[in-house]
Amino acid sequence: MFNNSIHKVSICIALTLTFSANAMAVTEIPFWHSMEGELGKEVDSIADRFNQSQPDYKIVPVYKGNYEQSLAAGIAAFRSGKAPAILQVYEVGTATMMASKAIKPVYQVFKDANIDFDESVFVPTVAGYYTDSKTGRLLSQPFNSSTPVLYYNKEAFKKAGLDPEQPPKTWQELAADTAKLRAAGSSCGYASGWQGWIQIENFSAWHGQPIASRNNGFDGTDAVLEFNKPLQIKHIQLLSDMNKKGDFTYFGRKDESTSKFYNGDCAITTASSGSLASIRHYAKFNFGVGMMPYDADAKNAPQNAIIGGASLWVMDGKDKETYKGVAEFLQYLVKPEIAAEWHQKTGYLPITTAAYELTKQQGFYEQNPGADVATRQMLNKPPLPYTKGLRLGNMPQIRTVVDEELEAVWTGKKTPQAALDNSVKRGDVLLRRFEQANK
């Protein structure tokens, strides 16, 4: 009996050691991101399902603040030897990441892990933003790509005598509609999130105008800014005039206007297509989604939208097993059913052709009118060399400059021309600084 007890104890110890060894064998992969609220919940859900699908790797999502904060945290962590394996970085951080010497290109990650990966699965206009201009190879993996869209309150439109199925197509129509909406009781006619991205960068591309020389920086770091031209000045003047009348309200530099919209304060907002998840969740009224307005007097408009959002960068300095786990997770993200679900639940673009086709086959766009607006904007016309995106060094800082100058317009301290001229002047100083640092 005594021997039998010893035998049972030995079995228990052996099983405990086995389970402990298995637990220790799991490779944890930190994934720093900037998805909060409903978006963060979906990131957690995807990570959990990947973790349950295999026994070797555990993705650990960690929210690290907004895009600017997470980029700064990621670079600082790399310098101290404590970087995550995966870092989500917004699109204007691309040039910074390329020059940082802190990354391992995605194509190299897959190659080293001996995992086949077809880069052609991505929608070309999305992948093109994150590829090496010289080799055409993918440096980071597209994840949450977006374009700006127009959200409008159908009930407010109906109350103002406007057609709730017809959002404004031009900026001139939007200006007229907001006046009617305000007269009908809306405290805020129009507001915009991400003013630099929407009112300067995407406005320029949507009208076939370059943001900078050298094809918006794709052809070299010696680019200069060019968004202080008559069409852009005219547009900011229109917004300034609306602001003085009380028809356009400025709430902040990021996506503050989104909550003002879904709370019912603002009748119209332009915001990221990725805001759709929050608007769906919180809005207690019928709303619609329309394309970005264009200037009625501009020739050949609209052209195409350029993407925002972010991609996933793999940080350098990790071990072989970590990189294999990273490769498997990135491969998991582009499975048609996973990529399609992410697109459908969040409002971000379908990043692969297969995800787009699957979404159509499932009847999602028919059941959710407006859900395909972001995609249609991106594919509206074949992109010109200077409307496929932008790759400018110190772009996060340039956006801050643009924000400061536009805020001077909204407060009446500067004219649109003076603000855009100074934005270009100050921005070019930042471009030259980046160019010198990366020669």
From Swiss-Prot:
Keyword hit for Transport = yes
What PANTHER family does the record tag this protein with? ARABINOSE-BINDING PROTEIN-RELATED, SN-GLYCEROL-3-PHOSPHATE-BINDING PERIPLASMIC PROTEIN UGPB
Q: Does Iron-sulfur count among this protein's keywords?
A: no
Q: Report the domain of life of the source organism.
A: Bacteria
Residues in the signal sequence:
1-25
Q: What is this protein called?
A: sn-glycerol-3-phosphate-binding periplasmic protein UgpB
GO biological process terms held by the UniProt record = transmembrane transport
Role description = Part of the ABC transporter complex UgpBAEC involved in sn-glycerol-3-phosphate (G3P) import. Binds G3P.
Keywords of the record, alphabetical order, are: Periplasm, Signal, Transport
Q: How does it assemble?
A: The complex is composed of two ATP-binding proteins (UgpC), two transmembrane proteins (UgpA and UgpE) and a solute-binding protein (UgpB).
Q: Which family does it belong to?
A: Belongs to the bacterial solute-binding protein 1 family.
Positions that bind sn-glycerol 3-phosphate: Y67, E91, S146, S272, G309, Y348, R399
Q: Which InterPro entries match?
A: Bact_solute-bd_prot1, SBP, SBP_1_CS
